[in-house]
């Protein structure tokens, strides 16, 4: 069974890497890529390949119920997307840095309505270090 994913900020550094890796994974489906209207032209290759390209997260979530939203954007965009995801019932993975304590408290409340995974530091080096530290 394939998991459908929606990648927010797909023209950005992390978003573009994630979109590529998801598209190459046999058990994942890149259902949609999103970007702000000023940057959506950078996603033409995805659209040509058959992936849905959107500028409005609500449109993507309505069209793709249950798809997991992956967000590595900016705090304000992440919070807006998280509210929409909770309202539409889309699970969410958040890797955005710079979230305030207030943002995190709101995300905790939203997580009562929809599965939500938050890890603002998903860099390979940090995760390898965290894995190795207990063995030292």
Predicted regions and their residues:
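Residues in the short beta-alpha loop(s) of Rossmann-like NAD(P)-binding domains
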Residues: 11, 34-37, 98
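Hydrophobic beta-strand scaffold residues
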Residues: 30, 53, 92-93, 116-118
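Glycine-rich, highly charged phosphate/nucleotide-binding loops
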Residues: 46-64, 70-78
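Rossmann-fold NAD(P)-binding glycine/threonine-rich loop
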Residues: 76-88, 95-119, 124-136
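NAD(P)-binding Rossmann-fold cofactor-contacting core
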Residues: 21-47
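N-terminal Rossmann NAD(P)H-binding glycine-rich loop of SDR-like oxidoreductase domains
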Residues: 8-20
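Extreme N-terminal starter segment of soluble prokaryotic enzymes
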Residues: 2-6
């Amino acid at each position: 069974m394939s998991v459908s994913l929606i990648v927010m900020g797909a023209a950005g550094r992390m978003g573009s890497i994630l979109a590529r890796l998801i598209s190459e994974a046999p058990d994942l489906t890149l259902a949609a890529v999103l970007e702000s209207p000023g940057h959506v032209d950078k996603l033409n290759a995805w659209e040509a390949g058959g992936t849905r390209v959107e500028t409005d997260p609500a449109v993507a979530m309505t069209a793709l119920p249950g798809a997991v939203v992956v967000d590595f954007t900016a705090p304000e965009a992440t919070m807006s997307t998280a509210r929409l995801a909770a309202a539409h019932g889309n699970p969410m993975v958040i890797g955005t840095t710079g979230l305030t304590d207030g943002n995190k408290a709101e995300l905790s409340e939203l997580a009562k309505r929809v599965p939500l995974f938050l890890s603002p530091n998903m860099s390979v080096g940090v995760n390898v270090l965290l894995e190795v530290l207990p063995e030292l």
